[in-house]
Amino acid sequence: MTLLTQSSTWQALSAHSKNVPHMRELFATDAARFNKMSLSACGLLLDYSKNRATAETLDLLFALASNSQLEAKIKAMFAGEIINTTEKRAVLHTALRSTAEQSIIAEGQDIVPEVQQTLNKMQGFVSSVTSGQWKGYTSKAITDIVSIGIGGSFLGPKIVSQALRPYWNPELKCHFVANVDGTSISEKLKLLDPETTLFIMSSKSFGTQETLTNTLTAREWFLAKGGLQSDVAKHFVAVTSNVAKATDFGIDADNIFPMWDWVGGRYSLWSAIGLPIALLIGMDNFRALLSGAHQMDEHFANAPLTENMPVIMGLLSLWYGNFFNAQSHVVLTYDHYLRGLPAYFQQLDMESNGKSVTLNGTDVDYSTGPVIWGGEGTNGQHAYHQLLHQGTALIPADFIMPLQSHNPIGEHHDQLASNCFGQTQALMQGRTFDEALAELANSALSATEKQLIAKHKVMPGNKPSNTLLMDKLTPSTLGALIALYEHRTFVQGAIWDINSFDQWGVELGKDLGNDVLARIGASQDCDALDASSNALINLYRQGKI
């Protein structure tokens, strides 16, 4: 057993998990439960009353956090200590949304001035493009942005841009390319005019396979459509640490934005990686996005554990994963603009906490990161919600909804909200056999049929959920929401004693992919790998089954 599972608090939680009353009973015996188990911070309200949790549960979870030195670990992250121990890096995405007055030290120097300098450079660039001052090679203004990246440099900008659609500059369109599948970029290029298109290449090394391949294809298309190599600088900019490679490609050094080792890809949308966002919504709104995240940073760093929104959400998720064998967690967004958030949180959580050894290399003997999945309401209610209500797996849920819509048409939002709240209620209370039977009392079914159908209509309830509300989806509330999930992820990793900031599984996939690519291009069939890989590679070389 690890020190974590040997601890008295862990053992107490294990014993306590077998004795928590049904949520129906918890609500029936405490009319003030919502008031006791909800809190507001940074423009968000969290209702966590619909959880399998009592005051004793929370006390034990907070004790587990304290015993795991969570507060010290939070301070270490914000202070720029080397908490990504396997890569010997600080973890300071929070510095990207700090105020200019702050001082944050990394590798012996204050990094805030460089962050502010980059924001100011972004401001100038955004102003140049959106004002029409930036011209393409035929002196036409830019109308289309193509953001080329992968992982965090793709998903963050795409999802945030999608979420903030009401704030877009109507004169600009943005297209996102990530997958190395040629179909992805080909379909985008069909829509574009090379004279008015600007490409943003985001890669720390300027050598990430997918990103470089797509960028080279974009340049080939640009040159084939009439542009010259000397025109590339008017249509390509980069976010990278490798200035030499970018300038060799044809990008002007003045149009290269920095990346830093202390920012992981999945936490990078707040940096110059967010340039597509800034172009679409303007720098004032981009700064509001940063401000909302900064407010959540301050809350996370300073609120006591018992009143700390990311801490509470992280602990409750851990509670179900480690003591109720919940192996997945569903995120349900009741706002069409937020439909991409489940995929973003999936990457954030699963890439961070999909680990199986502790910081000192000991194999864990407890579950770590769950599968994160989800979608938008009310679509999911006519699909996978069935499994949430009557399936055999326990799947905790997060419901996210703005109280006000950007598109208040008729009763649409009233119906959306009623479905959202109704789902949380149904998951919590379920339906007993007697209730199901009573509903069938006036039907034409026989007594035997009523008994049978009632059995099928029973729902156990006691299915946990959180509800997150905001007045309206704005850059600020979105920033706070994303930072909330970042810190929630940190909380779990800190208690599990794993490194939430490396991704060696991703690196292995890259290495083996490069090896296979070389074998595909070899002059002879492959026979050096396992039988399955050999066969698949050789079938691909033949081009037919």
Swiss-Prot record:
Principal location: cytoplasm
Pathway participation: Carbohydrate biosynthesis; gluconeogenesis; Carbohydrate degradation; glycolysis; D-glyceraldehyde 3-phosphate and glycerone phosphate from D-glucose: step 2/4
Pfam families linked to this entry: PGI
GO molecular function: carbohydrate derivative binding; glucose-6-phosphate isomerase activity; monosaccharide binding
EC identifiers of the protein: 5.3.1.9
UniProt KW keywords: Cytoplasm, Gluconeogenesis, Glycolysis, Isomerase
InterPro entries: G6P_Isomerase, G6P_Isomerase_C, Phosphoglucose_isomerase_CS, SIS_dom_sf, SIS_PGI_1, SIS_PGI_2
GO CC terms, sorted: cytosol
One of the GO biological process terms: glycolytic process
The reaction(s) this protein catalyses: alpha-D-glucose 6-phosphate = beta-D-fructose 6-phosphate
Active site: E351, H382, K510
Localization: Cytoplasm
Gene3D superfamilies according to UniProt: 1.10.1390.10, Glucose-6-phosphate isomerase like protein, domain 1
Function: Catalyzes the reversible isomerization of glucose-6-phosphate to fructose-6-phosphate.
Database matches in HAMAP family: G6P_isomerase
Family: Belongs to the GPI family.
Listed name of the protein: Glucose-6-phosphate isomerase
Species in which this protein is naturally found: Shewanella baltica (strain OS155 / ATCC BAA-1091)
